[in-house]
């Protein structure tokens, strides 16, 4: 039987390039992905390289608070 909090949590990844650069007329929004991470294996914030359709390239997507 599991004790305490669940190990797997749902996190939201947001494009750091869109957030830093600001939303311009060329980019109509901010790219976000929803994924899961294991809290015990990765206690820090998760950063993955994902494709951003607004930047038209692969950028680093960082974990944000819900």
From Swiss-Prot:
List locations, semicolon-separated: Plastid, Chloroplast
Cysteine disulfide links: none
The biological processes this protein is annotated with in GO are: translation
Q: Can the keyword Ribosomal protein be found in this entry's annotation?
A: yes
Keywords from the UniProt entry: Chloroplast, Plastid, Ribonucleoprotein, Ribosomal protein
Which is one GO molecular function term here?
structural constituent of ribosome
Source superkingdom:
Eukaryota
Any single GO CC term annotated in Swiss-Prot or TrEMBL for this entry:
ribonucleoprotein complex
**Entry-linked Pfam families:** Ribosomal_L33
Where does this protein have coiled-coil stretches?
Answer: none
Q: Which InterPro entries does this chain map to?
A: Ribosomal_bL33, Ribosomal_bL33_CS, Ribosomal_bL33_sf, Ribosomal_zn-bd
For this protein, the record's SUPFAM superfamilies field holds: Zn-binding ribosomal proteins (SSF57829)
The record, for HAMAP family, names: Ribosomal_bL33
What family is this protein classified in? Belongs to the bacterial ribosomal protein bL33 family.
Q: What name is this protein filed under?
A: Large ribosomal subunit protein bL33c
Source organism of the structure: Oenothera argillicola
Q: Gene encoding this polypeptide?
A: rpl33
């Amino acid at each position: 039987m599991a004790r305490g909090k669940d190990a797997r949590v749902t996190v939201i990844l947001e494009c750091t390039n869109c957030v830093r650069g600001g939303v311009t007329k060329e980019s109509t929004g901010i790219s976000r992905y929803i994924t899961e991470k294991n809290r015990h294996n990765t206690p820090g914030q998760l950063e993955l390289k994902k494709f951003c359709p607004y930047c038209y390239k692969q950028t680093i997507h960082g974990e944000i608070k819900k």
